[in-house]
Amino acid sequence: MRTVFASATLIACSLLAGCASAPNEPTLTLETSKSPEQFAACVVPKLQGRSMSPILSQPQRHYRITVPSTVAADNVIEAYKASSGGKVFVYERSLMASGFGRAAKECV
């Protein structure tokens, strides 16, 4: 009985950790001539137009756009300033295609 409880606890913790942490590798990496601010101003309305509810934040000199999910881990776009504009990292974690990455590509 103890083994079953310990296994269930370990599995539950693993699932929760996957929701709370960012993966090491982005799903998509893009370069843009736009600044992070210009990119965010483009992508947020596109996500809203796809019935998503993006949350924009600006931690430590970059922009982060998060789309919360009740079923999977949150989808995240991070836009950083680069020498020729910006660098964009897309972390699309939903199981089915949602148009999240496509919106980022359209704003490059």
Q: Predicted regions: what is each one?
A:
Residues 35, 70, 82, 93-95:
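Solvent-exposed coil/turn segments that connect beta secondary-structure elements
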Residues 15-18:
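C-terminal motif of bacterial Sec signal peptides marking the signal peptidase cleavage site
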Residues 89-108:
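C-terminal partner/receptor-binding element of secreted or periplasmic proteins
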Residues 28-30, 37-77:
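Post-signal-peptide N-terminal segment of Sec-exported extracytoplasmic proteins
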Residues 1-11:
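Bacterial N-terminal signal peptides that target proteins for export
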Residues 72-89:
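Amphipathic N-proximal alpha-helical interface segments
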Residues 20-23:
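Bacterial signal peptide processing site
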